[in-house]
Amino acid sequence: MSRSSPEQLSRFLAEVHGRPKKGLSQNFLIDGNILRKILAVSCVQAGDWVLEIGPGFGALTEVLVNQGAHVVALEKDSMLEETLKQLPIHLEITDACKYPLSQLQDQGWQGKGRVVANLPYHITTPLLRKLFLEAPNQWKTVTVMIQDEVARRITAQPGGKEYGSLTIFLQFFVDVHYAFKVSPGCFLPKPQVASAVVHMTVKENFPLEEPLRTKFFSLTRAAFGQRRKLLANALKDLYPKERVFEALSQLHFSDKTRPETLSLDDYLKLFYLLSLPA
């Protein structure tokens, strides 16, 4: 019987695990059709190395294994260890936010791999930032199920209310695609919000290397720190307002420009101009 079976999951919860833990965002996927769609979107092939964060009962894990992937799974809940060990995977019972991604090599990880996961919703943003701050060259693709609201932020275009620093951060590293929405009824227990699957293809080359990359993200975080402010005011702690006005003018933006107006490319050009000697 498949691990996406509601009956099998309910029996496991009743006999072994107990109630799903809200503090770990435990909403277990029980829809086989959604699992197959995630697999198709992820482009996982036999022999691929795949990092799965928060495997839970192992429904998605099972699908990845059956595809022939080498799966490294990071699970925080020790109550799930024994059932996950029944699958042919590399399992770490650990806090994914604290796990050094360099340790993947200790599991036999070879070359560039993929991330495929139903991410715990309460730590989605820090996990996504960790993947690209700590090991941006480790991945070919990242396919994750996340809260629909976050998915729309990640895929937002300039000018919209959902567009922000997380959008800029991820689009710096990836080309991102909103794949499909997932209703609460596909989970046990049902979450109170809709979910969505997004697929990210990691760029071959990133616009900036360190230490400039860190400085660039400081600029974009400051820009969106107070969304209602004009961009020049939002950046006043980093750059004199007159310098920002001058740079905006060179990019054909007015002094009244707000943070959500600029694209990633615009922000990169602005950063370049503001980095020039005064």
Curated annotation (Swiss-Prot):
HAMAP family: 16SrRNA_methyltr_A. GO terms for molecular function: 16S rRNA (adenine(1518)-N(6)/adenine(1519)-N(6))-dimethyltransferase activity; RNA binding. Pfam families: RrnaAD (PF00398). It is an enzyme of class 2 (transferase). It catalyses: adenosine(1518)/adenosine(1519) in 16S rRNA + 4 S-adenosyl-L-methionine = N(6)-dimethyladenosine(1518)/N(6)-dimethyladenosine(1519) in 16S rRNA + 4 S-adenosyl-L-homocysteine + 4 H(+). S-adenosyl-L-methionine binds at N27, L29, G54, E75, D95, N118. Belongs to the class I-like SAM-binding methyltransferase superfamily. rRNA adenine N(6)-methyltransferase family. RsmA subfamily. Gene3D superfamilies: Ribosomal RNA adenine dimethylase-like, domain 2, Vaccinia Virus protein VP39. Specifically dimethylates two adjacent adenosines (A1518 and A1519) in the loop of a conserved hairpin near the 3'-end of 16S rRNA in the 30S particle. May play a critical role in biogenesis of 30S subunits. It comes from the Bacteria. One of its GO terms (cellular component) is cytosol. Keywords: Cytoplasm, Methyltransferase, RNA-binding, rRNA processing, S-adenosyl-L-methionine, Transferase. It is found in: Cytoplasm. This is Ribosomal RNA small subunit methyltransferase A. CDD domains: AdoMet_MTases. InterPro entries: KsgA/Erm (IPR001737), rRNA_Ade_diMease-like_C (IPR023165), rRNA_Ade_Mease_Trfase_CS (IPR020596), rRNA_Ade_methylase_Trfase_N (IPR020598), rRNA_adenine_dimethylase (IPR011530), SAM-dependent_MTases_sf (IPR029063). Its EC number is 2.1.1.182. PROSITE patterns: RRNA_A_DIMETH (PS01131), SAM_RNA_A_N6_MT (PS51689). The gene is rsmA. Transmembrane segments: none annotated. PANTHER family: DIMETHYLADENOSINE TRANSFERASE, DIMETHYLADENOSINE TRANSFERASE-RELATED.
